[in-house]
UniProtKB/Swiss-Prot annotation:
Keywords: Cytoplasm, Hydrolase, Metal-binding, Nickel. InterPro entries: Amidohydro-rel, Metal-dep_hydrolase_composite, Metal_Hydrolase, Urease_alpha_N_dom, Urease_alpha_subunit, Urease_AS, Urease_asu, Urease_asu_c. This is Urease subunit alpha. The modification N6-carboxylysine is found at residue 218. It comes from the Bacteria. The gene is ureC.
Amino acid sequence: MTLRLSRRAYAEMFGPTTGDRVRLADTELLIEIERDFTTYGEEVKFGGGKVIRDGMGQSQRVAADVPDTVITNAVILDHWGIVKADIAIKHGRIAAIGKAGNPDIQPGVTIAIGAATEVIAGEGLIVTAGGIDTHIHFISPQQIDEALASGVTTMLGGGTGPATGTNATTCTPGPWHMERMLQAADGWPINLGFLGKGNASLPQPLVEQIAAGAIGLKLHEDWGTTPAAIDNCLSVADDTDTQVAIHTDTLNEAGFVESTVAAFKGRTIHTYHTEGAGGGHAPDILKVCGEMNVLPSSTNPTRPYTINTLDEHLDMLMVCHHLDPSIAEDLAFAESRIRRETIAAEDILHDLGALSMLSSDSQAMGRVGEVIIRTWQTAHKMKVQRGALPEDTARNDNFRAKRYVAKYTINPALTHGIAHEVGSIEPGKWADLVLWEPAFFGIKPSMILKGGMIAVAQMGDPNASIPTPQPVHYREMFATRGGALARTSLTFVSQMAADAGIAERYGLAKRIVPVRNCRNVTKADMIHNAWRPSISVDPETYDVIADGQLLTCEPATVLPMAQRYFLF
């Protein structure tokens, strides 16, 4: 017997299906379900009187033949699509995306549920891959709590704590600091990787940091990013299959942007602060977006351009870079980096896919818990100001959503050689997943899974009779305790360090994973974010021209995902 349900009734019971649209938080962004992997009339759902019961939606298969966990009827938002599906997790990895149930009695089942299977109800929820923040100043370990609760599950960068060097630069300098930070990584339920200091003109000081466990090297102007240092650093990276991140020379002391590009010699590099105010060659660092070997990112303090952006930047900059406002030269240095015209252009370059990644610059002018919020605020602002992208339709913003989610998931993973483990929702990858109610999308996740186990969730009073009574706030779950912590999170290192046996030598508990294929990534590999415009910046007016078009927009006076959701 067939029972017809209205779309509303179906969505309320099983979540949206093909052709249904979902608003992302309180933005003007709408996503539309492109495909539903489930079977109408055969959907599985857990609960009293529902489907996942013995002999019904649950089969008799043993643990070896069923997943450890199934997320049912979830909407997946990833760079490759926007679909409705059941997600299977086994041994900490995504095992399948498809139709869950009991294949003995149900048609089309690709994921068998058994007595060994836990269920997470995904009906009405959006699932995204855990975010990857590639611009972390490891100033305080409490950043990790904030990042994880925001939906970020991998943090890459450098530092040693609130040292003056770390306050300004993302470097973990030298083998001793590298060993200590890798040991500290064992205590946190998040994937971590550390960059060594790349500012040296001879190879050995850099090679020893890679051998100690660095996933790559960071060149920063505060340590002297000269053409000689750039050339040497990239040569070491080529020899060790690691990535180089660079914060270029704001003062143009050792040369202009053309000198830096020449020092790259066509070699792959991740350019931090390819943006309007964060640093690097003033005023035209944005030019590097047009280079095939440059993988550009920007940071969240300028995301998106608002009426308050300029006002807050000067004081932030003076503190972060150890400048003295009473010294005229220090003040001039700061003011040269803060330009409304290039900040406005940064919005548009993100929207057109010229800027491939977005990160935080945590506690060093950026906010570690706001990478995801500010990504989607930028997408909203551009939708409102520029309308639909050519790739989208009047019904949805699917392409724009895929472009923006890729900026903090798959593209950072590809850039830093970790896409074989994280960065997308695909079978075989580590099950770092973030579940969102659509009304709170991008702002407050419902639950964060690390390696297939719940790490953080919104949880009510532990003494209550049910999980939901107030106060409801983020609390660490069992994946953050005891031996489970080391088995649900990863530490990324160089292949050289892994081969040298640092895990045993340092006494590391977490599984170490070598980065790979860092040196053959190009701008063309940046998914949905591969545009390479020819950019010029007027040295007097700071106007930004890309492929002959002036890039400018007005600052936002109000944003979504803001005061509706936060008291403070």
